[in-house]
Amino acid sequence: MKIVVSRGLDLSLKGAPKESGFCGKVDPTYVSVDLRPFAPLPLEVKVTPGDQVTAGSPLAEYKLFSGVFITSPVDGEVVEIRRGNKRALLEIVIKKKPGISQTKFSYDLQSLTQKDLLEVFKKEGLFALFKQRPFDIPALPTQSPRDVFINLADNRPFTPSVEKHLSLFSSKEDGYYIFVVGVQAIAKLFGLKPHIISTDRLTLPTQDLVSIAHLHTIDGPFPSGSPSTHIHHIARIRNERDVVFTISFQEVLSIGHLFLKGFVLGQQIVALAGSALPPSQRKYLITAKGASFFDLLPKDIFSSDEITLISGDPLTGRLCKKEENPCLGMRDHTITLLPNPKTRESFSFLRLGWNKLTVTRTYLSGFFKRKRVFMDMDTNMHGEKRPIIDAEIYERVSAIPVPVALIIKALETQNFEEACRLGLLEVAPEDFALPTFIDPSKTEMFSIVKESLLRYAKENVVTSS
């Protein structure tokens, strides 16, 4: 199936790493296992500081669904269990042993029954890789998904491409074969053909995939790479019982690697990007999952209050300004550094704004059609919060036809029934990143949706499963 998306906005941000900018491998001293994505679920920590762990060792377990573990990606020693407000679990920090783990697993995918395969996924931390829609929560083992969507079309700013992720392996063919094994495992686990969404420029091993998966291509501006866009165009979610799972290309590689090679895939590709990072430092690295920023970035960056650190892309990533030793998030493959200006631009309201981004034609740049928007992004808000007046501008950049402003108003009044009727079942917080970015009213839509979905999932979805 060929999908063409017309709505959205391609952001060409300054600070992207060069496509040829690989700079070897970095073996970090510390890594963390990010537990923030599991906030809707109560977790039981299985380790204490001082414990020795190996790659694949259980670190935490779903309290309500025993036997589902979150596992360590590396060998090492647990040094800290970080908690936030109300003792909420944030991450488990591990002092990594040098080198790659040699812990061997032996699973024969062909001989495993579906029930046995589910137990392997739960035990080895593979089930924790899936996300569940509606409500964008960690996948629950009590649910049988109607569909599974595998995303190979992620086009968030600075995010490494599929080709970059294949650089982990000896050859592109080897990487794709591992991916095929991962797809086979998913198809067998759920008894269905998953949907694989890629772009036209990717050359997939279609002869190996066509019999076990539905293949689709998508073309269009950001956010055409969002799973919500794929689900909307291929098989819409129409009610809360329409459960679908989503998973990324990198996570499918982790699944295939365990079954084919017998080892936990503890490494990942990371893009160092952002206009606050010197051009010579903008590059791609091969490092351990959850690596500490201190091992990847120049040391002088951490003492500057004019730089904002983000784990992930600049639109949906996690702000790390209050963290003493920030580490990569669970699903993050980018470290973004943005300028944090301390002064305002003089007479900014009188300037023509030829190089400023505007969707409402506030600046001169809005009157000229340009295929791509080039901008030097920083953390300046360019104004204070104000009431929402023009609700139509959000629909111009939203890839799926939902009334953005009405959903936000329903969520702010905690009217979840109305929000679901308007389209909340189809969306995730990331779908509101671009409307938040271009919003003249400065409303933190991304945070509102994220917190609302978390609250609703805790009270209604998780406890009833």
Swiss-Prot record:
InterPro entries membership: NqrA, NQRA_2nd, NqrA_C_domain, NQRA_N
Entry keyword set: Ion transport, NAD, Sodium, Sodium transport, Translocase, Transport, Ubiquinone
Domain of life of the organism encoding this protein: Bacteria
EC number assigned by the record: 7.2.1.1
Pfam families referenced in this protein's UniProt entry, alphabetically: NQRA_2nd, NQRA_N, NQRA_SLBB
An individual GO BP term: sodium ion transport
Reaction(s) catalysed (UniProt annotation): a ubiquinone + n Na(+)(in) + NADH + H(+) = a ubiquinol + n Na(+)(out) + NAD(+)
Gene Ontology terms for molecular function: oxidoreductase activity, acting on NAD(P)H, quinone or similar compound as acceptor
Family per record: Belongs to the NqrA family.
Subunit structure: Composed of six subunits; NqrA, NqrB, NqrC, NqrD, NqrE and NqrF.
Role this protein plays: NQR complex catalyzes the reduction of ubiquinone-1 to ubiquinol by two successive reactions, coupled with the transport of Na(+) ions from the cytoplasm to the periplasm. NqrA to NqrE are probably involved in the second step, the conversion of ubisemiquinone to ubiquinol.
Protein name: Na(+)-translocating NADH-quinone reductase subunit A
Organism name: Chlamydia trachomatis serovar L2b (strain UCH-1/proctitis)
Gene for this chain: nqrA
